[in-house]
Amino acid sequence: MKAAVRSVKNFSKGYTDTQIKVRNATTNDSWGPSGTAMAEIAELTYDQNEMLEVMDIIDRRLNDKGKNWRHVFKSLSLLEYCLHNGSENVVRWAKDNIYIITTLREFVYVDDNGHDQGQNVRTKAKEITSLLEDEHALKEARGDSRERDRDRDRTRSSRFDDDDDDRAPYEESRLSRAPSRASRYDDDDRDHRSRRRSRSRRPGRSRSRRRSRRPSPSAEHNSAEENDPELQRVIEESKRQAEEDAKRRNMANDSEAELQKAIQLSKEEDEARQRHQREREQQEQAFMGNQQNAYQPVDFFGNPVQPQPTGFLQQQPTGFIRPQNTGFVQPQYTGFVQPQHTGFVQPQATGFMQPQRTGFVQPQATGFVQPQATGFVQPQATGFMQPQRTGFVQPQATGFMQPQRTGFVQPQATGFMQPQRTGFVQPQATGFIQPQRTGFVQPQQNGFFNPQPTGYMQPQRTGMMQPQRTGFSQPFESNNPFPVMQPQRTGFGQTPNAPMMAPNHTGYVHPQPTGLQRQTTGYTGNNNPYSRPLQSQSTGILQQQQQQSAPRLEPTKTGSNNPFAQFSNLPSQSTAPATKPMKPVRTGDDRFSNIAQAISTGNPMGTDSFGNIGLTRVPTQHTGSKFTNSAGQTIQAQATGNTHNPFQSQQATGYYKQPMQQQQNMQQPYYNQQNYNYQNQQPMQGMQQQSMQPQVGSLIDL
């Protein structure tokens, strides 16, 4: 039944005779393949086409399922036989597909009875793997198989020859006796020979030719190589690989040539770019050289002038920038003007005020900054340097701000002088005004200060301070450089009509009717040019009074020469005691009569015990009074009546606290007949003076 099914399947699948023989040798029957069938298949392997058909069926059987373990085992047995007796192509195929055989060493199958049927398969796979891995054992096995085949063929041929010799006489007698029987034996022998001949002829070669080829191994190897498709495929693959390598080398050579060509082109481009850059630089240098030659500054004799090392950016008429001569823009190619061609003023030729020639107060020359020249810088001794107590040491060198323009500082609200009104602080000698160095602002035609060799401003023609704009007055014959500020009732709507003073009167304003209303001023006779307290003021709309005239020069009890007393702490009090004239102090020593006379008269130019005059006299921290020659009572600071004054603060350090009294107007005219003859009139807006309580003291007594 199985044979019939197999025959139908062979026919339906279209298997060839060689494939059918291999399938019959590897059936699933319980018996193994016969030796004759395996020998015939081994003979077929010498033909290349039939060898491929044999190996194809063996490969399928080796990869069959586990239940068909007999297919696998019989295929391994047939392969082992072909390795011993087949062609060399079988050996090469087995080595190329050794992984299939190696995998079968792990073959496992257990049947329904619990028997491991894969044991035989694993054993056979291990034997074939060992044979393929051992080349020497494989050669010996194949050699032994050839010897056995030769012996078998020799034995068979000799047997056939002996049979023929023994049969000849018998055949002759027999043929003579029974011709029919002899012809029958001949027919049988011919059939037998024809079968053998056909069997040997099917592989495509005769046994005789195989025998003649076997003794020569080299010839057999050569013929096997010629008929081996794998070898041919390998050879073809090698040729193809060689061709690919040659092409790759050619491509590499081509790419190398292209790379060299690209490198050469890059070099040429780089050289061309550098050449163009050099040409452009040469052209620029030539153009710049022409420009430089065209605009090269020269002196009076035609020699080229080098640019001055100034902090200004140099400029030439060219708009090209040369970055190599400056850290920023090159001078000869910048768009900036060089110092010799620029409109900028050179520092040595500028019209601006030089520091050594300016009319401003030099810090090193002033008596207020240097403590060793004056004693007024110490804050504990004077309140002079404090902002709330000054009001008169303002930038005296200005004079740009005109009093008529500032209407925001009310006289009753502040006791400070406007900065444009000052100009009386002499820096080089004392903190007070030196008559021979006027220090007043000259009324020039322009609004600038001309630097004079003296360093002070000349008061000839100033157009800054207009006299008709001030509401303050000064007697014509008064030599007081600081005019008294008259308290007044301000009557708005009044038209000022004050003429301008002559240049020899230092630009100060004569008492003229102004739009501001004034009250009668009482003078205290104080010699201090700064301490001029104001009387209480009252404002009235559209009222006018005549100004009070010239003060008297007489010593009083309040004859203190301290210029800082009126700037001490101001409480809000309104009582003012009447001032009394002060009698001269008698020291009983005629040796110091001049000092006593100077102290008693309140002369600020009197000398002290050390020979100092004016502001250089010893201040109050070294004596009992404000100055060593300031005899009499000191002036008590009075309240201004305005508690919102931002400059009112505590009393300056170095002074003892004194009780505050009523605010009063003080005026101290001063006139020196021996050395100076000048008249000063200075309008002061909002200056409120304060008086201190009298304190009797004398340098001689101390």
From Swiss-Prot:
GO terms for biological process: actin cytoskeleton organization; actin filament organization; endocytosis. Residues 193-214 have a biased composition (Basic residues). Residues 136-160, 183-192, 230-248, 266-283 have a biased composition (Basic and acidic residues). Pfam families: DUF1720, ENTH. The keyword Transmembrane does not apply. It is a peripheral membrane protein. PROSITE patterns: ENTH, UIM. Changing residue 86 to S: Aberrant cell morphology and depolarization of F-actin. Residues 535-549, 683-695 have a biased composition (Low complexity). The modification Phosphoserine is found at residues 212, 216, 218, 223, 255. It comes from the Eukaryota. Binds to membranes enriched in phosphatidylinositol 3,5-bisphosphate (PtdIns(3,5)P2) and phosphatidylinositol 4,5-bisphosphate (PtdIns(4,5)P2). Required for endocytosis and localization of actin. This is Epsin-1. It comes from Schizosaccharomyces pombe (strain 972 / ATCC 24843). The lineage of its organism: Eukaryota, Fungi, Dikarya, Ascomycota, Taphrinomycotina.
